[in-house]
């Protein structure tokens, strides 16, 4: 829906959508045979709903000076409604496809893993509190079923989602006579439990620290016991060498900045030039984020 107000000094569009998609193409894990461990299949149902809004305002407009600003906002949610249609355990509810981390009535793209609740410390080792397969400086994870063991089928759970919660951007444009200054702020936000990623996987091999220049990673040492990541080069057999915390990738970025000048036509006519615009521009000049992985 389009709207405008104050003699079109404010205008924009608002859209809400909902849809359902059937027979999605997806690679299903299968028992490995003939070198194949996945097969593409048309399966499942997924619902989508979202909200998008664009609003433009012109706070100031005179002969020599103008200022306009545009705000964009979008939010999308999907939900898996069906996968294979199988209820193997007979509980009256369709089974999740855990091997592919697809869960009924959850968004596609879940972070299904062990839940980190802390870090094992040297004092825990001295007091005999660290279970077999772990060491100080490694992740302490939740024992979901309280059996004293850490197994993939019993102790992993949904701890978040990889898709963003929402996106927004703000673009400002200022014009004074022949000068124009524009800048855009862009942001992707995770909100609660959304837009997660795992930047700490390279810590399993200390060589990666040197090859990828990861010295700024907040990794565990005896002098840094409350670090975000475990000690370098050591991983637990229970969790595997690629396991690392899920960290929100939310950011706010000064994405585009441009300063331009339109050379007056009266000056250009002397050189038989119709139009000339001089400008300088910068991209991704500032980023505010807690994410320390690759962009």
Q: Across the structure, where does each feature detected by a protein language model lie?
A:
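Residues that define the transmembrane beta-barrel architecture of outer-membrane proteins
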Residues: 47-51, 65, 164-168, 250-255
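Composition- and surface-driven signal marking solvent-exposed, interaction-prone regions
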Residues: 11-16, 26-30, 66-70, 84-87, ...
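Extracytoplasmic gating/loop element in the C-terminal half of outer-membrane beta-barrel translocons
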Residues: 188-277, 281-283
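Conserved small-residue
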Residues: 41, 51, 58-162
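Solvent-exposed loop/turn elements at secondary-structure boundaries
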Residues: 16, 26-46, 89
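Membrane-embedded beta-strands that build the outer-membrane beta-barrel scaffold
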Residues: 1-5, 10-18, 51-59, 67-75, ...
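Outer-membrane beta-barrel and related beta-rich outer-membrane complex signature
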Residues: 24-28, 32, 75-100, 190-219, ...
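Flexible, solvent-exposed coil segments and beta strand-coil junctions
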Residues: 28-38, 93-94, 145-153, 231-243, ...
